[in-house]
Amino acid sequence: MKVWMAILISILCWQSSVWAVCPAWSPARAQEEISRLQQQIKQWDDDYWKEGKSEVEDGVYDQLSARLTQWQRCFGSEPRDVMMPPLNGAVMHPVAHTGVRKMVDKNALSLWMRERSDLWVQPKVDGVAVTLVYRDGKLNKAISRGNGLKGEDWTQKVSLISAVPQTVSGPLANSTLQGEIFLQREGHIQQQMGGINARAKVAGLMMRQDDSDTLNSLGVFVWAWPDGPQLMSDRLKELATAGFTLTQTYTRAVKNADEVARVRNEWWKAELPFVTDGVVVRAAKEPESRHWLPGQAEWLVAWKYQPVAQVAEVKAIQFAVGKSGKISVVASLAPVMLDDKKVQRVNIGSVRRWQEWDIAPGDQILVSLAGQGIPRIDDVVWRGAERTKPTPPENRFNSLTCYFASDVCQEQFISRLVWLGAKQVLGLDGIGEAGWRALHQTHRFEHIFSWLLLTPEQLQNTPGIAKSKSAQLWHQFNLARKQPFTRWVMAMGIPLTRAALNASDERSWSQLLFSTEQFWQQLPGTGSGRARQVIEWKENAQIKKLGSWLAAQQITGFEP
């Protein structure tokens, strides 16, 4: 009873999370958005099932289909049947394809496994499902999954796939098998290579009218033998003897969710002969095949891999001004998980880049992780019906603006504070953008070094700064006073690399002010253009004023 109560609570929590992300649309807009996406998915379905081609990645299709279902539930529409092919000339399956229920996480899988025994894990091979019917030892019929009850006659196509045994003996002589036709791969590593649109490629080969030699690039993984031997070990042995060797190789006994997780992680990183999108856990004990119905399999579940790329809704477009004055565009997202990382923002780049992407709030974008786990945009996969894009700020900033605070300088000023606090500059540990905003909002800094005047009491009474952290910050600010002269010059934004600045051997503000353009041009990695920038920088009125202020604070190198 406790187990079922836990499952019920999990379901309710899942439903709550779905409702929590329902769009704030009027009924009219909801109808328009749902209708547009429904039409697009129907077009993709027609291309997939009638033409054997795919205009969209498998993962994007799956996620947009799930998004459509979510919207339909939010606004009381009838959810569509996913991947429903046309049934013209359909053939009845001897045994229905049940499909497989997906587990949301390891905890849900653990609850499901707790009620069952004699469990086995298999890879969830990514291809197209098929029924193989053997009569009197020969392949009699091959049927596509279709809607689970009826499918297309694929006998001629399957008979040309060399990986599918055309004759069998013993218990398999009169049998019905269910499995996955897949694209054969050599050393496919799912973690690195992803799905490669394998499902669509297989469907394309199976739907073509010509009997191409390319069918030999396909294989089959049998995952069910309805009314077969009771013992899983016997099933696997007979299948392997008949030529279905992959089933025995990739079926393992498991006792709990931890063991499943280990196998799942192993197959995620291992070289496999097929593309996978997760694992399937099944009980050896199955009901008689006459009781099998689509959507009603209680003896098996799937635990899919998290997609390498996720479809995320754009909630807002925001503009940021960097320390150099360049305007960058950031998309605020409905949260998605990527490799155990919660992603809520992604950098689009420059205003021009944003305009080229043509991204607006309400659009659906494909997001993945680039090097060092940084989110990136891979594609815009769906644009909303109503698209209102914000106006970017005027491009009035440059590398010599906003050393002093003003209303128009807010963003660049904060960016300068974040920069000077970085490890490679003044090394102010424990404060980031949010902390700087809190300090500036409360104490209204005059310029980028005004924080040097804050007292312990002021820091302690700053909203947004924990009292336990205020003493640490005051200590960090005091330590900064002892940083080398070159660090302070870097904090002021001198347009030189750290290596060039160190090579200059400048150790005082007065010495730096009297250095010529020719002197700077001789430094490593510093050409004439960069040297002119240094001259413009040191002659700027704001820079001179900051230098004088630091001298008054007796910062090393700035004293008269």
From Swiss-Prot:
The gene is ligB. It comes from the Bacteria. Its EC number is 6.5.1.2. Belongs to the NAD-dependent DNA ligase family. LigB subfamily. Catalyzes the formation of phosphodiester linkages between 5'-phosphoryl and 3'-hydroxyl groups in double-stranded DNA using NAD as a coenzyme and as the energy source for the reaction. This is DNA ligase B. It catalyses: NAD(+) + (deoxyribonucleotide)n-3'-hydroxyl + 5'-phospho-(deoxyribonucleotide)m = (deoxyribonucleotide)n+m + AMP + beta-nicotinamide D-nucleotide. Gene3D superfamilies: DNA ligase/mRNA capping enzyme, Helix hairpin bin, Nucleic acid-binding proteins. HAMAP family: DNA_ligase_B. GO terms for biological process: DNA repair; DNA replication. Pfam families: DNA_ligase_aden (PF01653), DNA_ligase_OB (PF03120). Disulfide bonds: none annotated.
